[in-house]
Amino acid sequence: MSKPFFELRIYKVFPDKVDEWLEFMEKTIVPFQRLKGMDIVGNFYSESFDLISNDGVKTDVNRNNDDRTYIWIRKFESKEQMKDLYKKVYESPEWLDTMNDKVGELIDRKSILVYQMESLPYSLIQ
């Protein structure tokens, strides 16, 4: 059996779709996934980011300050549980009939980043 781990998901929200995306996540996707058993431990939104060079100097990479990034974290007890929950959520009629297409209208699916991470012993999130 595998160890518990976290999944960090990063999405780029389309311009002029931020409010709609945030409401869709809050009122539809998050409650639906929690009902299916997903342990969602954090949801975040950012409109900018900074890159810091090796000498500690901030570089001006995102000059337009229009990054529109949505980040969320889910926890799984094992790889087996993750596979089971993915199936329950993403193969369900509710997802396929009412949510899947809507997601593609609001975020850039080609830019999705997903990290599977193990919590370190000194982390507050376990």
Language model region names:
Residues 34-36, 77-80, 122:
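A short, structured loop/turn motif at beta-sheet edges
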Residues 7, 20-26, 47, 77-80, ...:
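Glutamate identity and glutamate-enriched acidic tracts
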Residues 1-2, 39-65, 94-126:
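Glycine-rich beta-strand-turn "strand-cap" elements at beta-sheet edges
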Residues 1-3, 11-14, 28-30, 66, ...:
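Homeobox/homeodomain signature
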Residues 17-45, 90, 94, 98-99:
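Short amphipathic alpha-helical segments
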